[in-house]
From Swiss-Prot:
Residues the record marks as active site: D125, D314
Comp. bias (Basic and acidic residues): 87-98
Main EC class the enzyme belongs to: hydrolase
Family that this chain belongs to: Belongs to the peptidase A1 family.
Primary localization class, coarse: secreted
Protein name, as recorded: Putative aspergillopepsin A-like aspartic endopeptidase MCYG_07979
Length: 430
C-alpha cells in the first residue's frame, strides 16, 4: 500500500416552526471557555458512563455504582452575571464575537448563550439536535442548584408552543423532558427570534450534576430532534440560509482557547489542505466511514473485522470511544496497560509508560493521526505500587456498535461541518 504525505503528521492519503434571524450575520465566531478543575472534577469513568448512556451502549461491570461527587462551577471564578458574558458589539451586523476567559483544563468546551436576554453557559453538541436549558420550572429543587436558570417570566419575547414536548433519553440513565417554547436566542451576535427551546421539568441527576453547563445546543441533523408532534429546526439550521456558507467549524485545541465559527472557514486556523469526507446522515449524525486503524506506525494498517466501520463526530463527548478490537490492539502496545472494571471502569496504565500514536481512517481515502500526547485523559495519582495510574483518553465501546470521535479527536484536528452534501473536512490545527 503506497502512502504519501498530504497533511504533515495529521492526515495521510490512503490507496418546522418558522423562526427568523434578526439579522443576516454572514458569519460569526464564538470563543469558548474550558472547564476548570474548580468547575468540574476531571473523571474518566464518569465521562465514559455519560457517553455510554447517551448512545445506549451497555455499561461495563463497575460502572453502575460509580458516582463521584460533582464540584460546583461557583467554587471557581467563572460565575457570570449581567448581560451576555464577554459579549462585544463591534458595530458590524455581519459578524458577532464572544470573548471568554480560558480556564485551567479542557475537559469540555462551553459557550456563552443568551435566551430571552438571560445569560447561560451551554455545551455545543454535534451528537444531538435538541436545544434545552435549565429553568425555574424544573420539579426538583436540588437540580436547580448552581445553575443559571431560564425564567420565562423575565422574558418579553417568550412564547409557549402549545401541545409540543421534547424528551431526550440518553440510554436509560440520563434524560430531560418537558414543554417547548420559543424565544430570542443569541450566540456570538447572531440571533434567531423564535428558536425552539426545551424547558425540562424533569432532568436526570447525571445532567443536573453537571454544574458547569446550563444546557445544550444541538448541532446534529434535524432527524434526531425529539420535539413531538412536530420536529423543530436547530439553531444552525435556522441561520444557515443567511450565512455566507452553510458551514460551521470546530477548533477545539488542547490547553488553548477554542472556538466555533458559523458561515465561514478561517484558513488561519488550520495547516495544509482540508481533506473532505462524505457524511452518512441517515441516522441523523455526522457519521463517517472509519474501518481502518494502525498503532504507532502507518505501515501496519489493519481492517476492523467486528465493528460497524463508521464513527460519529461528537463534540458533546470528551473521550475517543472505538471498537473493542482497536482499543485492545492499541493498549497491547502500552506496557502495563490493563482493563480495570472494579476500580477505574476502563483502560488504565502506568503514567510513565511509553504511548504510541494512533492512526484512524477518516473516510475511505485518508487516515488521521491522534498523537500520543492527546491519549492520556487523567492522572489518578499513585497506585498500590507507588506508580501513578493514568486513565486513557481512548476507551472501548464494549461491542456497542458505535464509534464516537469525541474531544480527544477534535484536539488533533480542525473540523468543518458542511450541510452541503453533507460532509466534513479535516486538517491539522495551525
Amino acid at each position: 500500500m503506497h502512502l504519501s504525505s498530504l497533511l504533515v503528521a495529521v492526515l495521510l492519503p490512503l490507496a418546522l416552526s418558522k423562526p427568523t434571524p434578526r439579522k443576516k450575520p454572514g458569519s460569526f465566531t464564538v470563543h469558548l471557555a474550558r472547564r476548570s478543575e474548580a468547575e468540574y472534577a476531571r473523571d474518566g469513568p464518569t465521562d465514559l458512563q455519560r457517553a455510554y448512556a447517551k448512545y445506549g451502549i451497555p455499561s461495563t461491570q463497575g460502572m453502575d455504582g460509580y458516582r463521584p461527587e460533582p464540584i460546583s462551577r461557583f467554587q471557581g471564578n467563572s460565575k457570570i452575571a449581567g448581560g451576555a458574558p464577554g459579549a462585544k458589539d463591534d458595530g458590524k451586523d455581519e459578524k458577532g464575537e464572544v470573548e471568554n476567559n480560558p480556564t485551567s483544563h479542557d475537559i469540555q468546551f462551553l459557550s456563552p448563550v443568551t435566551i430571552g436576554g438571560q445569560p447561560f453557559i451551554m455545551n455545543f453538541d454535534t451528537g444531538s439536535s435538541d436545544t434545552w436549558v435549565m429553568n425555574t420550572d424544573m420539579d426538583d429543587e436540588e437540580a436547580k442548584k448552581d445553575h443559571h436558570l431560564y425564567d420565562p417570566r423575565k422574558s418579553k419575547t417568550y412564547s409557549k408552543l402549545d401541545g409540543l414536548t421534547f424528551s431526550i433519553k440518553y440510554g436509560d440513565k440520563s434524560h430531560a423532558s418537558g414543554p417547548v417554547i420559543t424565544d430570542v436566542m443569541d450566540i456570538g451576535g447572531a440571533t434567531v427570534r423564535k428558536q425552539a427551546i426545551g424547558l425540562p421539568t424533569k432532568v436526570a441527576a447525571s445532567l443536573a450534576n453537571d454544574k458547569s453547563s446550563d444546557g445544550l445546543v444541538g448541532l446534529a441533523m434535524n432527524k434526531l430532534n425529539t420535539v413531538r408532534p412536530d420536529k423543530q429546526k436547530t439553531f444552525f439550521e435556522n441561520l444557515a440560509e443567511d450565512l455566507d456558507e452553510p458551514v460551521f467549524t470546530a477548533q477545539l485545541r488542547k490547553g488553548k482557547m477554542g472556538s466555533y465559527e458559523f458561515g465561514a472557514i478561517d484558513k488561519t486556523k488550520y495547516a495544509g489542505d482540508l481533506v473532505n469526507v462524505p457524511v452518512n446522515n441517515k441516522n441523523g449524525f455526522w457519521e463517517i466511514s472509519s474501518a481502518l486503524y494502525s498503532v504507532g506506525q502507518l505501515d501496519k494498517i489493519q481492517k476492523v473485522e467486528n465493528g460497524t466501520g463508521t464513527a460519529i463526530l461528537d463534540t458533546g463527548t470528551t473521550l475517543l470511544i472505538l471498537d473493542e478490537e482497536v482499543v485492545k490492539a492499541y493498549y497491547a502496545q502500552v506496557k502495563g496497560a490493563r482493563y480495570d472494571a472494579s476500580r477505574y471502569a476502563g483502560w488504565v496504565y502506568p503514567c510513565n509508560a511509553s504511548m504510541p500514536s494512533l492512526f484512524l481512517a477518516v473516510g475511505h481515502d485518508h487516515m488521521a493521526i491522534i498523537p500520543s500526547s492527546l491519549l492520556t485523559f487523567q492522572n489518578y495519582g499513585p497506585g498500590p505500587d507507588g506508580t501513578d495510574v493514568c486513565y486513557g483518553g481512548l476507551q472501548s465501546n464494549n461491542a456497542g456498535g458505535i464509534q464516537i470521535l469525541g474531544d480527544v479527536f477534535f484536539k488533533a484536528l480542525f473540523v468543518v461541518f458542511d450541510y452541503r452534501g453533507p460532509s466534513v473536512s479535516l486538517a491539522p490545527h495551525a
